[in-house]
């Protein structure tokens, strides 16, 4: 059986993360929000807090795995994209915000372990 492409594996990881977070009570505002220089995988609402969720999937743990792939450069891109989102979607500008990471590692099959890090980094 052929292995899933990185794109389809990434979409499957985002779908799994979305389903999990909705099960935790978060509400989807938008997904795959793109701007110059970045993309926000999931933008969700947790009560009144806008949550910018970065979904990271890695097949193997090499080079730090899924969590290790969120370096300072990636964090800056996410903060920049979130700032642009709040400028464009000004109805959310006065809400508290946070950055979460959902990390998945291993086979692309359903049921792979998922790690949810709330407030994964400060900006």
From Swiss-Prot:
Transmembrane segment boundaries: none
Pfam family for this entry, one: UPF0102
GO molecular function, one term: nucleic acid binding
Superkingdom of origin organism: Bacteria
InterPro entries reported in the protein's UniProt record: Restrct_endonuc-II-like, tRNA_endonuc-like_dom_sf, UPF0102_YraN-like
Family stated for the protein in its record: Belongs to the UPF0102 family.
PANTHER family cross-referenced by the UniProt entry: UPF0102 PROTEIN YRAN
Protein name (Swiss-Prot/TrEMBL): UPF0102 protein PputW619_0932
